[in-house]
Amino acid sequence: MVFVWLTAFFLVVALIVLVIYQLMCLADLEFDYINPFDSSSRINKVVIPEFVLQAALSVLFLLSGHWAMFLLSAPMVYYNYTLYQRRQHLVDVTEIFNHLGREKKRRLFKIVGLIILLFLSLFWMIWTVLLEEDE
């Protein structure tokens, strides 16, 4: 059971790193350190891996029977799926300045949700280690 929590912890850390990378690219664009083409291509390269990691995390929670954690991570997967279906998951080079605020808010909300998942995963990992140590 510790393996599940350890895997979840590393998946959440990887997701946080990907979203922070996207936020850094948007901040660099906002302060004019990078051009729109480079910024959007860098962000678009990590969007699909982020979606796949988030789905893998939810499947891990589902298959391991951690329903509460699955229910906490499922809305983010659904949100990612809806973005993908509407073809709004990629950043458009020509519209990136118009949607800069919205894109930053979207990623900040993701960071908040992922940090909550990170702390919960860390808590349950420690709890599981302590329970297995008593047995």
From Swiss-Prot:
The keyword Ribosomal protein does not apply. GO terms for molecular function: cargo receptor activity; signaling receptor binding. Its main location: endoplasmic reticulum. Keywords: Endoplasmic reticulum, Golgi apparatus, Membrane, Transmembrane, Transmembrane helix. GO terms for cellular component: endoplasmic reticulum membrane; Golgi membrane. It is found in: Endoplasmic reticulum membrane; Golgi apparatus membrane. InterPro entries: Cornichon. The chain crosses the membrane at residues 2-22, 51-71, 111-131. It is a multi-pass membrane protein. Pfam families: Cornichon. GO terms for biological process: vesicle-mediated transport. Interacts with HKT1;3. Acts as a cargo receptor necessary for the transportation of the cation transporter HKT1;3 and possibly other secretory proteins from the endoplasmic reticulum (ER) in COPII-coated vesicles targeted to the Golgi apparatus. Belongs to the cornichon family. This is Protein cornichon homolog 1. The lineage of its organism: Eukaryota, Viridiplantae, Streptophyta, Embryophyta, Tracheophyta.
